Amino acid sequence: EGQYPLAAGTETIGTMMQKAGHKTALIGKWGLGGPNTAAEPNKMGFDYFYGFNCQMWAHSYYPDFLWENDKKVFIEGNEYMPVCARLDEGADPYDIRSYDKFNQKHYSCDLMYEKIEKFVDENADNPFMLVWTTTVPHSTVQAPEDEVMYYVNKLGEEKTPITDGGWYYPVLYPKSAYAAMITHLDAQVGKLVQKLKDMGLYENTVFIVT
């Protein structure tokens, strides 16, 4: 895990903001230094980290674990799914139930968003910087089934499911799933903005989107 590690002592936006007196967090994906190396997030300027520490494992939105600081946290209800897993032999690629094993209990975007709100709550009285490195809408295109079906009903059935996606999992409705992912992220950004307004922090917060 942790491809392309940064050199020890590299100056990052995290270290700069720490020096300026801010509490810092990175929530999402970090692929710049694996666990127990000199380039893991906590050693690169981030007081708190939660998310993926590997580009490849981030291909799944229903992982069986995520990292919280330097601890691997297993997600109860999500089972291990090998990278490059495929539909079961003989499964109907046009039957939505054939894809059940890829869509599990806990959607990683929601787990990360919970940590975002928690970090904001805990640091409301302090200067803080949050880096939200969302994995949306990277492949594998996955979203909660009800949100995908909203777009299937709106856009119609798709005739070309992805059954062999290389490093990514099979997807029955790739276009609808992609749209659902964007909508899901948009809703979470909206929730965060509203939360900051409710807390009286919005006017004193700078948003940088890249």
Locations of regions flagged by a protein language model:
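Formylglycine-dependent sulfatase
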Residues: 1-210
